[in-house]
């Protein structure tokens, strides 16, 4: 081999090419040795050089400072233009973004140039540009500037990071850079999952694509061209050709010979020769046009890229394709800047003047230009044709510049330009059609004031951004906000001024009397905001009850009086006027801190008292205060005893104290009438709301039993009251029986089914019976048994039939039971069919019957009919109106009554399984309000006048919030457990009071803004005072905090009540010596406008006063509104700083560039129709339909389907390829083609014709073409593009589809259709556990097939030649497995004798 010298710089790309060349010429073994030597050489030189990175190696280019200064200056100019209303918020934003992006890119180039000019051996430069470590982007951040970052929503933050890591970041820059860093981490985490799922879907759709044959014989193919992005080639033709097979022969005219033949595979050398002969449209074979059924042939696929030779038969190319596309998914990074799409990632191509000179336009251009507005809000000219312009320095020197169509010119004819000055920009209109998306930007007000429209024409219409879209005129207009202070007053407040009035600081702007409607006794609370959290709560908030009963009213302390006499501007005020009261006398109070304690207390200590478990769970269990530590379960102390006397019931005992996060519940009992009332503090009650229950044992049973109604009428079941409301009284019949539920196989039973046991018999190890009776053991479910003891007498009747007729019947007193037995009381008869073992007999002394039975059963089994005579308990249920209720005292107005409501807990015939007492009827006490109106009933606890009614002893005495709390219990301090003894002496009375009241709650910040005005509420009445209807109780006043002129909003209505006061800070006065400008009152002037020689406006505004020597201007702020913008305000509206004024609508380009990361790839592969509930413009389905419609006119239905599918296939391949290429990811075209083939292989039937197909059915294109050949009336169909998910679910193998998604649906559908799975793919065979038909398994499959043919030959069968011919005719190769039956000849075979 001759040595030769190659004079090139060895960098990453060059090494790659060199190694590829070496492999091709010298093979793998020698290449391995060469690469090893290359590595050693590299390490040796790196060691000698001692390349390391130090801080001094990070050299910042000196040009950075003036580049940033230029950018700052440009942005300040843009900001001034925006403040003047010359450009919109969108244009300002885009200008700022573009300026900083351009600066950052320029600085990047400066960094590279600086290294080249100063130190080419700089370690940073060598590492980054050799490709060893790092890249230019990271170098830029180290020594240039970090640039723009995006926020979590993907919008660019228009504040760039000017510093680099060498200089160090400021705090603000660091926080902004954290946005991007965090976004990067989150994106990486999410993208990994997305990429994995994408790979799974791709594998599923293509797993059955295997190389099954050598040549499908197709003459079709696709044309390959270099892939370009604008003028830049991103995928060269040579690269695209390597590994392909030619579909046509290539002839060189110059050399007069064929360079390559059809069906020849293309190597790298051959690719170079072909491109030299033919630059474009090289016709190659492709998986897209392969005729092999459900597979790809060797020649259409081409090389296996791993080996550089034709792919082997049995290669699972579908899996390889899926992995090749899915794996780089994680590399599709989101850009560090710009995911919101203000610009397209690349700065538009700019044209700058090469020399100083004067610009000359050709004459033809004068009529071929239109005025346009650039995206930065600048006026410019747009060329409609390709043109050349001339820049001339002098007569001798000139330069001609070629400008393509749709170039934006920033210069005019005859204008002088400097060298490097920007003169034009190539517009994106000349690029291929890009999909655009609609974006919006909200503009908010910078100051308080009034909205003013200037040349803004509105038009209402419905649109995508809501039902009302306000559209401005064609050229937009200005929206001004005129400065002023805003007062927002409550609707009910009468104002004390008019528009044009001058108001001073501290004057009353509005006031309102607060009057009572009904009159009554006053009760006032006032407290500071967040007073619940304060420790000194009782000094700030006073709770006083009305003086309606004779009790000691507490003296109002100094704080209260001071608060009443002064303004309550920092306090909330709660005023209640009671106008109806109903008082229950002689009520005793017991306090508990949990429902469980109360239940135990009632059950164990006070058998004749019954507690309502929950008056209203939503009210009684809610938490009113801050959360504290979880309260432990406590139990009533055993020293709580019951003592009875003539006057009532008194209790001495310990009770646990509630923590601050619990609502207290009070148990009220009346000493004369056995009523027990339970409610939460401050409870509001409604009409018919139950507040108490009758305490009685009258309806309490000893155990469970059967319920029967006699003459009782009830309503339907009430789930809230948990019972049936009694409409008409009657008698409730109760047949007692004792029921125990036991877990089977875990507990030993001491009794058997059919036993008759005495009272006190041991049933279980720790359970004895309460009654004597017949034992019945039944099975409720697989786990539990039920033991039922039915009290009663056993009797064996002489006539079994007569007894059976009396089964489950009542027998009244004096009536015959059976065999002459007469009932002494009401009994219930039940026939027992099972054997009864008993020594019990009917005795003559028995209360149930009068006569005795002479012969009795004793210790013997009776297999005949046995009668069980069961006792019945009768309960009288009166009508509701006849139930006695506790007496009460009516006060003031007699508007409240109490009424009783009865609820039966169980329905007629219901069996209650229990061994504990059961309450059958609940008698409740309810409120009966005679008047409804805007009034609420409330319950109050009033202590009767007496000395110390309640004595307490406790560890901590804490401040209380309610007077009766202090009398009843001690609040806990600092969350300590406090136990206190509560003692109610006999004869000490409390009144239980229900009242109707008006509630007036006044918040200190209820109707005004505290920074502009002050709210004062003055009380005109005192606590406990009786007021008549329409009396004033308090007065609200609004005090102004600013002086100035009142300018009422033009749109101020009764609903708004907003006013504007213009004070001194809202206007400026300028002196005018000589006003050359014609100024008028009301003129709107822009910032920096000249209003007189040498006098510039410091701020934009409106002239409100004009004199000969001075002008007063009201400060204002203009906002330019573009067309199609949605306005959120109207002319004359009052707005605050930060309020939204307008939503600007604009279009932004969506390039092939992967600005959204993986979603763009997914959008293409899933063939999405919509994005974010909006139709996706120019989507694949619309594009295919349009192509099919055009082709159908030209070629007819059948050819049009194939033609339009081919077009969409090429579009898809190129789109997906360009997306990956934009990220520097190289994927061979053939992998994408394999996947796209699966997406575009089916059509949807429109009309079935003579076929058996139904409209809407999906079928493969080649199958319907074959079917149509054999019918007279063809089926009509149209092409369809399926996303990879849908294609996976519509595959022929139901096992593969079911293992992917929607398992139940797929299997159900397959079962209904009676589908057969021929196990052709890899996935199905893996699931079944067979050898897969690919790789070595493919050859095994072929071997089995040939062996089968030999066996048939040996058996005397030969292949039928007619069948062989028919088989060859069919284009669709049939790969289905043939399952042979033993008793018949397989299809296509016949006996040798027959063949002869």
Curated annotation (Swiss-Prot):
Keywords: Chloroplast, DNA-directed RNA polymerase, Metal-binding, Nucleotidyltransferase, Plastid, Transcription, Transferase, Zinc
Gene Ontology terms: biological process: DNA-templated transcription
Catalytic activity: RNA(n) + a ribonucleoside 5'-triphosphate = RNA(n+1) + diphosphate
Domain of life: Eukaryota
Binding sites annotated in the UniProt record for Zn(2+): 216, 290, 297, 300
InterPro entries for the chain: DNA-dir_RpoC2_beta_pp, DNA-dir_RpoC_beta_prime, RNA_pol_Rpb1_3_sf, RNA_pol_Rpb1_4, RNA_pol_Rpb1_5, Rpb1_funnel_sf
Gene Ontology cellular-component annotations: chloroplast; DNA-directed RNA polymerase complex; mitochondrion
Cellular localization per UniProt: Plastid, Chloroplast
UniProt-listed SUPFAM superfamilies: beta and beta-prime subunits of DNA dependent RNA-polymerase (SSF64484)
Enzyme class: transferase
Co-factor binding details: Binds 1 Zn(2+) ion per subunit.
GO molecular function: DNA binding; DNA-directed RNA polymerase activity; zinc ion binding
UniProt EC number: 2.7.7.6
Entry annotated with the keyword S-adenosyl-L-methionine: no
Cofactor: Zn(2+)
PANTHER family to which the protein is assigned, alphabetical: DNA-DIRECTED RNA POLYMERASE (PTHR19376), DNA-DIRECTED RNA POLYMERASE SUBUNIT BETA (PTHR19376:SF68)
HAMAP family: RNApol_bact_RpoC2 (MF_01324)
Family indicated by similarity: Belongs to the RNA polymerase beta' chain family. RpoC2 subfamily.
Subunit structure: In plastids the minimal PEP RNA polymerase catalytic core is composed of four subunits: alpha, beta, beta', and beta''. When a (nuclear-encoded) sigma factor is associated with the core the holoenzyme is formed, which can initiate transcription.
Function, in words: DNA-dependent RNA polymerase catalyzes the transcription of DNA into RNA using the four ribonucleoside triphosphates as substrates.
Name of this protein: DNA-directed RNA polymerase subunit beta''
């Amino acid at each position: 081999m001759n040595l030769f010298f190659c004079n090139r710089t060895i960098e990453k790309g060059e090494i790659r090419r060199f190694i590829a060349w070496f492999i091709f010429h010298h093979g793998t073994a020698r290449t391995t040795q060469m690469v090893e030597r290359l590595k050693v050489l590299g390490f040796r030189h790196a060691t000698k050089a001692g390349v390391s990175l130090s801080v001094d190696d990070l050299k910042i280019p000196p040009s950075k400072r003036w580049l940033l200064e230029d950018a700052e200056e440009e942005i300040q100019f843009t900001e001034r233009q925006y403040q003047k209303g010359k450009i919109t918020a969108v244009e300002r934003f885009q200008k700022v973004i573009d300026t900083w992006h351009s600066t950052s890119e320029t600085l990047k180039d400066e960094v590279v140039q600086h290294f080249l000019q100063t130190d080419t051996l700089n370690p940073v430069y060598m590492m980054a540009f050799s490709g060893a470590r790092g890249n230019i982007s990271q170098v830029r951040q180290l020594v240039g500037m970090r640039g723009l970052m995006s926020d979590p929503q993907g919008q660019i933050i228009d504040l760039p990071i000017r510093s680099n890591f060498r200089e160090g970041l400021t705090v603000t820059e660091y926080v902004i850079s954290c946005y991007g860093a965090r976004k990067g981490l989150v994106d990486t985490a999410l993208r990994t999952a997305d990429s994995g799922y994408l790979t799974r879907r791709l594998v599923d759709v293509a797993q059955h694509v295997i190389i099954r044959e050598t040549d499908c014989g197709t003459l079709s193919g696709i044309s390959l061209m270099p892939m370009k992005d604008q003028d830049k080639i991103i995928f060269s033709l040579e690269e695209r050709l390597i590994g392909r097979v030619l579909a046509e022969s290539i002839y060189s005219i110059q050399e007069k010979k064929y360079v390559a033949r059809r069906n020849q595979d293309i190597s790298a050398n051959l690719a170079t020769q072909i491109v030299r002969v033919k630059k474009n449209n090289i016709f190659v074979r492709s998986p897209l046009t392969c005729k092999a059924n459900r597979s790809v042939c060797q020649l259409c696929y081409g090389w296996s890229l791993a080996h550089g030779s034709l792919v082997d038969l049995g290669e699972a190319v579908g899996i390889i394709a899926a992995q090749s596309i899915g794996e780089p998914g994680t590399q599709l990074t989101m850009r560090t800047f710009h995911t919101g799409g203000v610009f397209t990632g690349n700065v538009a191509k700019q044209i700058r003047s090469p020399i100083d000179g004067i610009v000359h336009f050709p004459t033809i251009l004068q009529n071929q230009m239109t005025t346009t507005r650039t995206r930065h809000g600048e006026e410019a000219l747009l060329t409609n044709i390709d043109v050349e312009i001339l820049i001339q320095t002098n007569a001798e020197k000139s330069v001609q510049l070629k400008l393509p169509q749709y170039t934006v010119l920033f210069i005019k004819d005859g204008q002088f330009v400097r060298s490097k000055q920007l003169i034009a920009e190539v517009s994106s209109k000349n690029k291929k059609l890009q999909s655009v998306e609609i974006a919006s930007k909200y503009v908010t007000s910078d100051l308080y004031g009034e909205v003013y429209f200037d040349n803004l024409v509105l038009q209402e219409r419905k649109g995508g951004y809501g039902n009302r879209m306000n559209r401005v005129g064609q050229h937009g207009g200005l929206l001004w906000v005129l400065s002023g202070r805003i007062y927002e007053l409550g609707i009910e407040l009468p104002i004390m001024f008019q528009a044009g009035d001058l108001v001073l600081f501290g004057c009353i702007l509005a006031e309102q009397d607060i009057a009572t409607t009904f009159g009554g006794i006053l009760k006032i609370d006032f407290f500071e905001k967040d007073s619940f959290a304060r420790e000194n709560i009782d000094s700030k908030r006073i709770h006083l009850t009305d003086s309606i009963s004779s009790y000691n009213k507490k003296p109002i302390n100094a704080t209260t009086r001071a608060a009443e006499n002064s303004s309550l501007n920092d306090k909330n005020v709660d005023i209640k006027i009671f106008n109806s009261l109903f008082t229950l006398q002689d009520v005793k109070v017991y306090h508990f801190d949990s429902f469980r304690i109360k239940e135990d207390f009632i059950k164990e200590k006070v058998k004749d008292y019954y507690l309502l478990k929950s008056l209203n769970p939503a009210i009684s269990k809610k938490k009113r205060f801050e959360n504290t530590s979880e309260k432990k379960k406590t139990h009533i102390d055993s020293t709580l005893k019951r003592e009875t006397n003539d006057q009532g019931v008194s209790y001495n005992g310990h009770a646990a104290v509630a923590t601050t996060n619990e609502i207290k519940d009070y148990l009220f009992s009346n000493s004369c009438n056995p009523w027990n009332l339970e409610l939460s503090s401050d409870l509001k009650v409604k009409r018919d709301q139950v507040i108490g229950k009758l305490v009685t044992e009258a309806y309490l049973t000893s155990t469970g039993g059967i319920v029967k109604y006699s003459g009782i009428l009830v309503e339907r079941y009430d789930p809230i009251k948990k019972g049936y409301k009694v409409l008409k009284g009657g008698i409730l019949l109760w047949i007692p029986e004792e029921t125990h539920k036991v877990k089977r196989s875990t507990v030993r039973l001491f009794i058997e089914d059919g036993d008759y046991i005495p009272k006190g018999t041991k049933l279980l190890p720790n359970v004895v019976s309460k009654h004597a009776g017949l034992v019945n053991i039944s099975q409720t479910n697989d786990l539990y048994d039920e033991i039922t003891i039915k009290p009663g007498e056993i009797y064996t009747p002489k006539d079994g039939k007569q007894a059976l007729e009396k089964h489950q019947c009542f027998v009244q007193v004096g009536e015959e039971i059976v065999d002459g037995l007469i009932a002494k009381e009401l009994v219930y008869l039940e026939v027992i069919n099972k054997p009864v073992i008993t020594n019990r007999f009917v005795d003559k002394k028995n209360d149930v019957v009068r006569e005795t039975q002479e012969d009795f059963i004793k210790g013997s089994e009776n297999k005949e009919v046995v009668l069980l005579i069961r006792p019945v308990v009768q309960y009288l249920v009166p009508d509701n109106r006849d139930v006695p209720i506790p007496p009460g005292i009516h006060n003031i107005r007699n508007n409240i009554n109490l009424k009783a409501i009865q609820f039966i807990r169980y329905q007629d015939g219901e069996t209650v399984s229990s061994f504990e007492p059961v309450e059958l009827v609940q008698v409740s006490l309810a409120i009966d309000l005679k008047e409804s109106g805007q009034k609420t009933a409330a319950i109050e606890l009033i202590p009767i006048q007496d000395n110390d009614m309640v004595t307490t002893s406790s560890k901590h005495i804490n401040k209380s919030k309610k007077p009766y709390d202090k009398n009843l219990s001690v609040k806990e301090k600092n969350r300590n457990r406090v136990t206190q003894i509560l003692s109610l002496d006999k004869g000490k009375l409390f009144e239980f009071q229900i009242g109707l009241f008006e509630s007036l709650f006044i918040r200190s910040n209820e109707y005004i803004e505290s920074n502009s005005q002050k709210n004062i509420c003055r009380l005109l009445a005192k606590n406990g005072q009786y007021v008549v209807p329409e009396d004033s109780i308090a007065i609200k006043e609004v005090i102004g905090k600013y002086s100035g002129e009142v300018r009422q909003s033009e749109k101020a209505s009764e609903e708004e009540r907003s006013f504007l006061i213009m004070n001194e800070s809202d206007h400026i006065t300028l002196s005018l010596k000589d006003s050359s400008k014609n100024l008028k009152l009301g003129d709107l002037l822009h910032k920096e406008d000249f209003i007189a020689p040498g006098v510039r406006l410091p701020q934009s505004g409106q002239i409100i006063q004009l004199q000969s020597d001075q002008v007063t201007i009201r400060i204002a702020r203009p906002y330019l509104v573009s067309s199609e913008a949605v306005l959120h305000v109207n002319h004359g509206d009052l707005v605050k700083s930060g309020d939204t004024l307008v939503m600007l609508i604009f279009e932004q380009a969506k390039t092939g560039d992967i600005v959204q990361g993986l979603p763009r790839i997914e959008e293409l592969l899933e063939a999405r129709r919509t994005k974010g509930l909006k139709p996706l413009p120019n989507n694949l389905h619309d594009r295919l339909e349009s192509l099919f419609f055009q082709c159908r006119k030209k070629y007819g239905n059948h050819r049009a389907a194939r033609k339009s599918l081919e077009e969409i296939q090429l579009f898809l391949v190129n789109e997906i390829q360009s997306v990956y290429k934009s990220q520097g990811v190289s994927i061979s075209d053939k992998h994408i083609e394999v996947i796209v083939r699966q997406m575009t292989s089916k059509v949807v039937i429109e009309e079935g014709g003579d076929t058996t197909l139904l409209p809407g059915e999906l079928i493969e294109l080649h199958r319907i073409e074959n079917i149509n050949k054999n019918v007279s009336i063809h089926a009509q169909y149209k092409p369809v593009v399926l996303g990879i998910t849908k294609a996976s679910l519509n595959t022929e193998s139901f096992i593969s589809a079911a293992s992917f998604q929607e398992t139940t649906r797929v299997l159900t559908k397959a079962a209904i259709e009676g589908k057969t799975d021929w196990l052709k793919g890899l996935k199905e065979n893996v699931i079944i556990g067979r050898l897969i038909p690919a790789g070595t398994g493919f050859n095994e499959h072929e071997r089995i097939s040939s062996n089968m043919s030999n066996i048939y030959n040996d058996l005397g069968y030969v292949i039928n030649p007619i069948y062989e011919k028919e088989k060859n005719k069919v284009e669709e190769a049939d790969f289905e497995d043939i399952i042979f039956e033993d008793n018949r000849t397989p299809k296509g075979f016949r006996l040798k004798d027959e063949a002869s």
